[in-house]
Every structure is written in C-alpha cells, then in structure tokens.
C-alpha cells in the first residue's frame, strides 16, 4: 500500500477508536497529536496507539506491554502472537478503564 493509503487507513482507525470510546461513555480522554492517539483514563492509566508509517504498522503501548500490528488482508495482526488489533486494544481499554468495552458494530 502507498504511504497515503496507510495514512488514510490509520486516520480511520483513530476515528473508530475515538468514536467507540465516546459511544461507550467511558471515563477517558483522548488526545490525537500527529501519529499518536493517547487514551487517558480517570485512574491515570494510559493506552497509546501509534501509527508507524515507515513500517506501515500500528502500535499499541499499554500496561500489558507493547504490540506491533501489520495489515494482513482486512485485519491488523500482531507480529508477536498473531492477536488482532481491535481485540488487543479493547482488552487494554477494559484493563485501563475497569469498564466493559468492545469494538462491536
């Protein structure tokens, strides 16, 4: 994929994350700065989502660790364990917020 296609896909991912957090009414603030989306919970915990254009990867940093995801077909899959991006992020958000959360729909 071209760099502009990757940037558009990653913008769409950031939009989906922010929308899902808003729709769930989580006690969390999101801040998007350049290639980084920071999710901060009332507890002070944070989850960081970063797009890495050079490698065309999406990265997640959370208390549970750091994860790198590459596009495979229509999904973003972790290089370390084959986990799916949205499932991994949902678990990190549940852990940080202490609330039920998913990306269904």
Curated annotation (Swiss-Prot):
Q: Which PROSITE patterns match?
A: FRATAXIN_1, FRATAXIN_2
- Would you tell me the Gene Ontology cellular component terms? cytoplasm
Q: Which GO terms describe its biological process?
A: iron-sulfur cluster assembly
One Pfam annotation reads Frataxin_Cyay
GO MF annotation list: ferric iron binding
Q: Which UniProt keywords apply?
A: Iron, Metal-binding
Q: Does the keyword Chaperone apply?
A: no
The UniProt similarity line reads: Belongs to the frataxin family.
Per the entry, what this protein does is: Involved in iron-sulfur (Fe-S) cluster assembly. May act as a regulator of Fe-S biogenesis.
Its name, as the record gives it, is Iron-sulfur cluster assembly protein CyaY
> Whose protein is this, by species?
Chromobacterium violaceum (strain ATCC 12472 / DSM 30191 / JCM 1249 / CCUG 213 / NBRC 12614 / NCIMB 9131 / NCTC 9757 / MK)
**Taxonomic lineage of the native organism:** Bacteria, Pseudomonadati, Pseudomonadota, Betaproteobacteria, Neisseriales
